[in-house]
Amino acid sequence: MHERHIGPSQEEIDHMLGFLGYKSLDDLMHAALPNGVQSPPDIKIPSHDELTCLTQLAAFAKMNRIKTSMLGQGFYNCITPAVIRRNILENPSWYTSYTPYQPEISQGRLEMLINFQTMICDLTGLEIANASMLDEASCAAEAMLLAKRVSRSSSNKYLVHNGVFPHIRRVLETRADAVGVEIVDLPEGQSIDFDHFGVYAQYQSASGKLLDLRPLFSRSKRAGAICVIGCDLLMLTLFTSPGELGADIAFGSAQRFGIPMNFGGPLASFLAARKAMERSLPGRLVGVSVDADSNHAYRLTLQTREQHIRREKATSNICTATVLMAIAAVAFAQHHGPKGLRAIAHRINTVAVGFARLLKQTAFRVSSLDIFDTIEINNPTQVCVEAESKYDLLFWKVDDNKLRITFDEVTARLDGDLPERLSKVFGISPDKIRDLGCNYDSCDCSFYGDLQQAREGLSSVASRNISVHSDLARHPLRRFSGYLKHPVFNNYTGEVALMRYLKALSDKDFALDRGMIPLGSCTMKLNAAFQLEPVLWPEFANLHPFAPLGDADGTLQIIDQIETWLANLSGYDAVSLQPTAGSQGELAGLLAIRGYYKSLNLDRDVCLIPASAHGTNAASAVLAGMRVVVVACDQQGNIDLDDLRLKASKNAHALAALMVTYPSTHGVYEDNISEVCSVVHKYGGQVYVDGANSNALIGYLRTGDFGGDVSHLNLHKTFGIPHGGGGPGIGPVVAKAHLAPFLPFRNRVHKPSTDLPAVKHMGGPIASSDYGFAGALYISWAYIFCLGSQGMKRCTAVAVLVANYIAKQLSDTFPVLYTGKNNLVAHEFIMDFREVTRVSGITVDDVCKRLIDYGFHAPTMSFPVPGTLMVEPTESEPFSEIQRFIKTIRSIRAEIDRVIDKTYDPDNNPLKRAPHTLEQIASDKWDRPYSRRTGIVYTSGKYWPASARIDNAYGDRNIFCTCPDLPD
């Protein structure tokens, strides 16, 4: 199976090996890997072909039992329009792109992300929103930390209303404890007579009751506190926006905008805030700037907030978003338009309120009719058990005396035999239940969202005396303010228009379907189409994360296998799949270390971090309640052992951990890694190995064997999950046995029939569901199942081979900054441009923009060393593309030499004016001292960037993060 995944043929592999002076891949790896490090045991995972893989996945899918979920709790049935499924979720132009650090070749997804931000701002009534977060519970934690940063209060108390979802409450407790925040319960109606920095309430409480939060927020604001709302986007199409209620921050999940539940995700959450908080906002933020031709263009703005720049002082450790899901969610809004969204919400509300009224006519006691979609019943007796066992209905059981029923886009349709099944459970006539949908069809809900139309609509509804709807029409929290008025939300409700719009946007972007993306530390390898197919199969996609475990037998077997495989491949004893990104895996691992020391009554909080480490490491350490102490690197880019010993001994009483990336962020296998781990262990600390570079390890080296106590792995790098334009990802944490009990909590013990010990994970949860973004795990399962252990080992060796081949080919063009044993690199290497910049004035930014003209995505720029490019080609690239990249870098060097010898003007040359757009080439005006053909580097099938070079400084000086007005 590896023949399809690995780009170069055997003959081409032999050619590259010969060029480097090695006879086999194993010879090369033996020469590159450090001496004295234990080889992994022979892990036997057989390889399989595509058909066998899909057949096995189909068998797992049949083991799942999809019942009618009315569980709610932030996860809802929804309909994914085929136009979105086909044109976004199954389209490599969208799912194989990377985070848009190079904005000129990312204008399509940047436009969709600013559409997403605009949608969130409109619906929440707040001025600024980011480009999506991870799961809803971790987003709630980020909202809490944002409130703490911007509050005028010195208090450490955060008030949490008792109506929030319990899984969100548990994650808040985990995150608050680590940073010294005290969570204080706030029962409904309780007065506040003490200082607090923030208050958080759920707009529609977990019980379903709609809360008028204005009095609560008014009291808190007088005390200098920040007011936070958890809200539902669909509900906000009918009810007053959080901003109008007085909220300073609003967050929630966009899952019900067309994103399947998939046993917990992937999905996109959102976070919006007052404009004054824009520089404290976590996560990615897309803004409007201008390009060199004075055209509007989009870019990531205010990046100085983020961890890759501010490290331990960053606003968050989140270094990505859930871009693909955010794009699908906003496309859902464009597909339906504001009227269509209102209609969906109105039907849900109509059916929910109507059903609650029918229940009140029975022996059941309903808590409130003041609801959007959820009904709480106070005396259900055995309803839950009977509904599930006899009628395949899932209700949320609060306790023995209370249950909740939630209607959504699917169940509110009352299709099929759902009315009959509900009738048998509750003793209500099925005709009366079915009539709720008919009543909806007779009601005009078009007036919501416009003040004047709303006022006129009230009398219209009243005159028709439609009692089912009069509560909504007269509700004190009804929404009068408009939203989604921009043409981008009103011009694409027809499928042809939306299809063409999405196609036009994808054509603006550079993804793996266009060419190589040699981003260092990113591993932009093949995301095989067949591996992605099962993600949207209904047996997987429609599984609620809080469904009974017996309903998820197939998915849980897949999870068991992945956990066992990952543990064996990395050398650890336990795995948690809960982290929804690599950053969250880091946090989970560090919290496990923290929990371990707390269990021993030891106060250890110092985290040693090499100066070369990614900024996420430092930001994660701070969020885990640790103090960062930086360890120097030597001239070869390795950890300075003398400085490590000094820092470890100096902090011996408080040393908790060392975070180290392996291979290093400098692209080499550090020879002294075992000694590094021994030093930390000697002084009582734990070793956290960042697994971001595991594509250089699998099959040859296990971080758990050379001294690692805990690591995270990036399934979106090493194990085939696509990057999705900046997310979603999965960052499972793997740990030794002594840390296993402190991994994120889950309700289920790993089955002892597998190779892993049965250990209960009792650490605090860090995500909304036990298995995080479980819906993407099928991709990694298929990747491992098809390649097998030997195929993955070959992938590692070919990735290292290609990196060394390119590095040696280009060593006389630009120097390779760091090498390891035998002058070899790992799976990536750093090209040093600093001397060239000094003599020519050509910067790495100029080179990156010029690479666009040649049809390449730029390598990673100025990380980990300013003035350099880090190149990671991966094992999947065809040899022809590798050769084209080498030729391109040499051509760019020749262009730089023409600047040095003054053949080219130092400020008006193909590099300084890159990238070159089709608009520029087609223009009658050409004010450049080189030809158009020289500028564009024309080839067959050429990719044209959508914008000229974008002005970064302008974008940061003029913050504008919603859809700009369309030109006349």
Curated annotation (Swiss-Prot):
Name this polypeptide is given: Glycine dehydrogenase (decarboxylating)
EC numbers for this chain: 1.4.4.2
Enzyme category, top tier: oxidoreductase
Similarity-based family: Belongs to the GcvP family.
Molecular function GO terms recorded: glycine binding; glycine dehydrogenase (decarboxylating) activity; pyridoxal phosphate binding
Entry keywords, A to Z: Oxidoreductase, Pyridoxal phosphate
Pfam families (UniProt xref): Aminotran_5, GcvP2_C, GDC-P
Subunit structure: The glycine cleavage system is composed of four proteins: P, T, L and H.
Biological source species: Tropheryma whipplei (strain TW08/27) (Whipple's bacillus)
Gene Ontology biological process terms, A to Z: glycine decarboxylation via glycine cleavage system
Cofactor(s) needed: pyridoxal 5'-phosphate
GO cellular component: cytosol; glycine cleavage complex
Record function comment: The glycine cleavage system catalyzes the degradation of glycine. The P protein binds the alpha-amino group of glycine through its pyridoxal phosphate cofactor; CO(2) is released and the remaining methylamine moiety is then transferred to the lipoamide cofactor of the H protein.
Modified sites of kind N6-(pyridoxal phosphate)lysine: K717
InterPro entries in UniProt: Aminotrans_V_dom, GcvP, GDC-P_C, GDC-P_N, GDC_P, PyrdxlP-dep_Trfase, PyrdxlP-dep_Trfase_major, PyrdxlP-dep_Trfase_small
HAMAP family: GcvP
Reactions listed under catalytic activity: N(6)-[(R)-lipoyl]-L-lysyl-[glycine-cleavage complex H protein] + glycine + H(+) = N(6)-[(R)-S(8)-aminomethyldihydrolipoyl]-L-lysyl-[glycine-cleavage complex H protein] + CO2
Encoding gene (name): gcvP
